[in-house]
Amino acid sequence: MYRAVTRQIEVTVEPNFVPEQSSADRSRYFWSYTIVITNSGEETVQLKTRHWIITDATGRQQEVKGEGVVGEQPTLAPGERFEYTSGVPLSTASGFMTGRYQMVSESGERFEIDVPTFSLDSPDNKRVLN
């Protein structure tokens, strides 16, 4: 599990390779990832936007920006958490993702929180060491 905390908001990520949606012959590899956002602060916050940078094993990057996550802009009161699962395809057997969420506080302040960088590894990823 990967973890980041920004302004008392914790984001954890658990990636999982999905072999039944992947095919090495077609250079298609798919991962699901489950994210839990926990508000340990003292103020209610709302997730407004997401910004992802997805990098494959060749260094090719894809940038994804959008409103909310999985069609929602969750509001988290102190002590509340929000969990969702999404997915990402790559044309290589490994890669990584990193990102940020834009949040807005109850008082109207906008700020960003980090999503921890997490690794996408498949069983087909052959590493050669000397």
Curated annotation (Swiss-Prot):
Residues 3-127 form the ApaG domain. InterPro entries: ApaG_domain (IPR007474), ApaG_sf (IPR036767), Uncharacterised_ApaG (IPR023065). Transmembrane segments: none annotated. One of its GO terms (biological process) is error-free translesion synthesis. PROSITE patterns: APAG. Gene3D superfamilies: ApaG domain. HAMAP family: ApaG. NCBIfam families: PRK05461.1. This is Protein ApaG. It comes from Bradyrhizobium diazoefficiens (strain JCM 10833 / BCRC 13528 / IAM 13628 / NBRC 14792 / USDA 110). The gene is apaG.
